[in-house]
């Protein structure tokens, strides 16, 4: 179990649950960051007394600096630099990357360079630059332990037996609009899209779960985390969200990880691994369940999932373009400036427009990210 951790994005959904795990397990918190929620961050600071704090938003950063004036807490700059300083803060064993978007990439690489454990909750880091990130982690010996429930499940099922792995079975609920036609989803509102049937999550990831883009991002992430090809991963729709994922081994054995839909469990495991600690989470009562159901995804009704898998096969800068365009499109949708079905259409258009780079450098990836965001802004606002 780690003794100290920095939490990037401590006021978001994953960040707040990470805070709760640190409280329960007595893990020292050395650094905390937020985007804009200074009010909650100050409450967290009062309780955990970190050495460092930062807010990414410029106005929020000034508010934080003013509130902490005269204290011993170092207040970092706004923007990416504040996150990077948190990720490399002294005497920190682990960094929880609970920020959303490509902004988490450089801080994660910095933490890897510092040989810290990465409790990875930022999908975009591996989606955009998985090959680079995993290579650098191997070079430094930094541990990357997934926080996503699906990847945590796979991590636990493999349990070091990488050579015995035949196939990853990546499960997803299908979201709140499972079975809806494209005609029906055309009128979906942000308020409907953020209401996931099983999980309590932030707005962006809730929309991604509704469109199934989230499962596509997880598909790409799994490729890099576990060193497999697209042909080694099968997506299964599992409405109950009880089987968080499974693996098929070379002898035909299938090992699955089951549990209640509670993100505190994979967060705790990422911080305590290789130990397993007592948890206050609800227990799974198998006798209370009427059944577990699994089905193949309908790609016509889930075009974002198909698009992501196509990008996984294509590789290069395609996943980075897709991820950035999707992030920008979802932001427009949440502000009622883009239709639900237009999320897929706009991301697909960005992929068609932006130049493909087969073997991108980190700079190429970041440039592709910026270009994709600009494309969405220019053509859809």
Model feature map: region roles:
Residues 1-381:
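Catalytic, metal-anchored helix/loop core of enzyme active sites in primary metabolism
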């Amino acid at each position: 179990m780690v003794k100290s951790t920095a939490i990037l994005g401590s006021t978001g959904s994953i960040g707040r649950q990470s805070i709760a795990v640190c409280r329960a397990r007595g893990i020292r918190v050395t650094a905390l960051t937020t985007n804009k929620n200074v009010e909650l961050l100050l409450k967290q600071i009062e309780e955990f007394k970190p050495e460092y704090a930062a807010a990414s938003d410029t106005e929020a950063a000034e508010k934080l600096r003013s509130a902490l004036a005269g204290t011993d807490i170092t207040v970092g700059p706004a923007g990416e630099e504040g996150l990077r300083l948190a990720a490399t803060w002294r005497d920190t064993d682990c960094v929880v990357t609970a920020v959303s978007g490509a902004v988490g990439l450089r801080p994660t690489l910095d933490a890897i360079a510092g040989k810290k454990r990465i409790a990875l909750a930022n999908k975009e880091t591996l989606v955009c630059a998985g090959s680079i990130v995993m290579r650098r982690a191997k070079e430094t010996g930094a541990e990357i332990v997934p926080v996503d429930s699906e990847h945590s499940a796979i991590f636990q099922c493999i349990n070091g037996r990488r050579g015995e792995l035949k196939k990853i079975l990546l499960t997803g609920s299908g979201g709140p609009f499972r079975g809806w036609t494209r005609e029906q989803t055309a009128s979906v509102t942000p308020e409907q899209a953020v209401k996931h049937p099983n999980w309590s999550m932030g707005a962006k990831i809730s929309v991604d779960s509704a469109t199934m883009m989230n499962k596509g991002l997880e598909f790409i992430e799994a490729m890099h985390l576990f060193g497999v090809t697209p042909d080694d991963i099968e997506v299964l729709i599992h409405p109950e969200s009880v089987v968080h994922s499974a693996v098929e081994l070379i002898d035909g054995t299938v090992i699955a990880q089951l549990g209640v839909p509670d993100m505190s469990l994979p967060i705790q495991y990422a911080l305590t691994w290789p130990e397993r600690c007592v948890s206050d989470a609800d227990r799974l009562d198998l006798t209370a369940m009427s059944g577990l159901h699994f089905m193949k995804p309908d790609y016509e009704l889930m075009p974002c999932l198909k698009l992501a898998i196509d990008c996984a096969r294509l590789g290069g800068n395609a996943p980075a373009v897709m991820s950035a365009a999707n992030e920008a499109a979802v932001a427009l949708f949440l502000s009622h400036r883009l239709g639900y079905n237009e999320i897929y259409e706009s991301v697909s258009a960005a992929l068609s427009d932006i130049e493909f780079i087969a073997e991108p450098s980190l700079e190429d990836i970041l440039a592709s990210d910026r270009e994709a965001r600009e494309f969405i802004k220019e053509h859809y606002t």
